[in-house]
Amino acid sequence: MQIFKELWKMEKDDPKRFWNELAMKAMDDIYWFKAWEKVFEWDYPRFSWFKGGKTNIAYNCLDYKVKRFASKPAYIYENPELDLSYSITYSQLFSLVKKFASALRGSGIKRGDRVLLYLPNSIEAAAMILACARIGAI
């Protein structure tokens, strides 16, 4: 609880420093193509976080992780009703996402297009969501 109180106080007293330090500590887990110039900027009514920085959520979820964790489980699926339990490694998930992304592109879906997925909770559903993010579909 003491650590929480210290972090809360730091965030309250100097939020820009707090978020900058937190982001710097997360550099091993979040790849930035370009580092930010400003942590936070508020020009009412607009505000920006990590202004000038460039990262990519799809890249961070798989491309960056597969380099370090290729054979580690990326997703573990459990369905007690069907008595199913299986997992997929980062390498396997990366391959599946690339196949789904290719299929989406082949169907004419491009950056900015809206995609509706109606799938059961599964590894394939997660892979399809990541594939949409990978090609920039919404």
Regions found by a protein language model. Name each.
Residues F4-M10:
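Adenylate-forming
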Residues E11-K12, R105:
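Short regulatory alpha-helical segment in sensory/regulatory domains of signaling proteins that mediates
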Residues A58, Y75-I129:
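Conserved AMP-binding/adenylate-forming core of the ANL superfamily
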Residues A133:
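Anion (oxyanion) recognition and catalysis
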Residues D43-K54, P80-I88:
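Acyl-group handling in specialized metabolite and lipid biosynthesis
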Residues K12-K34, G53-I76:
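A short N-terminal helical cap/helix-turn-helix that marks the beginning
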Residues G136:
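Structured binding elements
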